[in-house]
Swiss-Prot record:
Name assigned to this protein: Biogenesis of lysosome-related organelles complex 1 subunit 5
Origin organism lineage: Eukaryota, Metazoa, Chordata, Craniata, Vertebrata
Coiled-coil regions listed: 154-186
Encoding gene, per UniProt annotation: BLOC1S5
Residue positions where N-acetylserine is found in the record: S2
Annotated disorder: Hermansky-Pudlak syndrome 11: A form of Hermansky-Pudlak syndrome, a genetically heterogeneous autosomal recessive disorder characterized by oculocutaneous albinism, bleeding due to platelet storage pool deficiency, and lysosomal storage defects. This syndrome results from defects of diverse cytoplasmic organelles including melanosomes, platelet dense granules and lysosomes. Ceroid storage in the lungs is associated with pulmonary fibrosis, a common cause of premature death in individuals with HPS.
Family (UniProt): Belongs to the BLOC1S5 family.
InterPro entries xref list: Bloc1s5
Keyword Manganese belongs to the record: no
Subunit composition and interactions: Interacts with BLOC1S4, DTNBP1/BLOC1S7 and PI4K2A. Component of the biogenesis of lysosome-related organelles complex 1 (BLOC-1) composed of BLOC1S1, BLOC1S2, BLOC1S3, BLOC1S4, BLOC1S5, BLOC1S6, DTNBP1/BLOC1S7 and SNAPIN/BLOC1S8. Octamer composed of one copy each BLOC1S1, BLOC1S2, BLOC1S3, BLOC1S4, BLOC1S5, BLOC1S6, DTNBP1/BLOC1S7 and SNAPIN/BLOC1S8. The BLOC-1 complex associates with the AP-3 protein complex and membrane protein cargos. Interacts with BLOC1S6.
GO BP field: anterograde axonal transport; anterograde synaptic vesicle transport; endosome to melanosome transport; melanosome organization; melanosome transport; neuron projection development; otolith morphogenesis; positive regulation of pigment cell differentiation
Purpose: Component of the BLOC-1 complex, a complex that is required for normal biogenesis of lysosome-related organelles (LRO), such as platelet dense granules and melanosomes. In concert with the AP-3 complex, the BLOC-1 complex is required to target membrane protein cargos into vesicles assembled at cell bodies for delivery into neurites and nerve terminals. The BLOC-1 complex, in association with SNARE proteins, is also proposed to be involved in neurite extension. Plays a role in intracellular vesicle trafficking.
Length: 187
């Protein structure tokens, strides 16, 4: 039962060959030592589970790492397949769709840009015509105003002359009326 020591017979009998008293006391002490050693081994085998637990722990960690490694390998393989499918199928489809759509969008944008440029050009031409018309109209009004202001002294002179003539006629008329009235008042 002991690991590497000598076994003593059960019952603590002395080893054959007899011995002196000193030897018997040593033999008993040696036997007790062996018994204690055997009890320690029995205790460690029955009650000390550290080596077993350490072995089980190592085994569990090894299995976990293997399974984890396999699981990670499966995940990496799935990712690799997904990336391969994306590169082989999805990206070319997307690229072709984008090319078709982008060319249509580019054509539409170009047409819209041309329309906007034409509208802007028409608007600028209309504004220029309107501005030219306003400038011409303003010049015409200024010429008319200048002519009007130039004619004013002549018209004023004419009006003043007509007024003076009308006043003279009225004076003459009132003078005649006074004469006629004076004729009638003498009666």
């Amino acid at each position: 039962m002991s690991g590497g020591g000598t076994e003593t017979p059960v019952g603590c009998e002395a080893a054959p060959g007899g011995g002196s008293k000193k030897r018997d006391s040593l033999g008993t002490a040696g036997s007790a030592h062996l018994i204690i050693k055997d009890l320690g081994e029995i205790h460690s085998r029955l009650l000390d589970h550290r080596p077993v637990i350490q072995g089980e722990t190592r085994y569990f960690v090894k299995e976990f790492e293997e399974k984890r490694g396999l699981r990670e390998m499966r995940v990496l393989e799935n990712l690799k397949n997904m990336i391969h499918e994306t590169n082989e199928h999805t990206l070319p489809k997307c690229r072709d769709t984008m090319r078709d759509s982008l060319s249509q969008v580019l054509q539409r944008l170009q047409a819209a840009n041309d329309s906007v440029c034409r509208l802007q050009q028409r608007e600028q031409e209309r504004k220029k015509i309107h501005s030219d018309h306003l400038v011409a109209s303003e010049k015409q009004h200024m010429l008319q105003w200048d002519n009007f202001m130039k004619e004013q002294p002549n018209k004023r002179a004419e009006v003043d002359e007509e007024h003076r003539k009308a006043m003279e006629r009225l004076k003459e008329q009132y003078a005649e009326m006074e004469k006629d009235l004076a004729k009638f008042s003498t009666f």
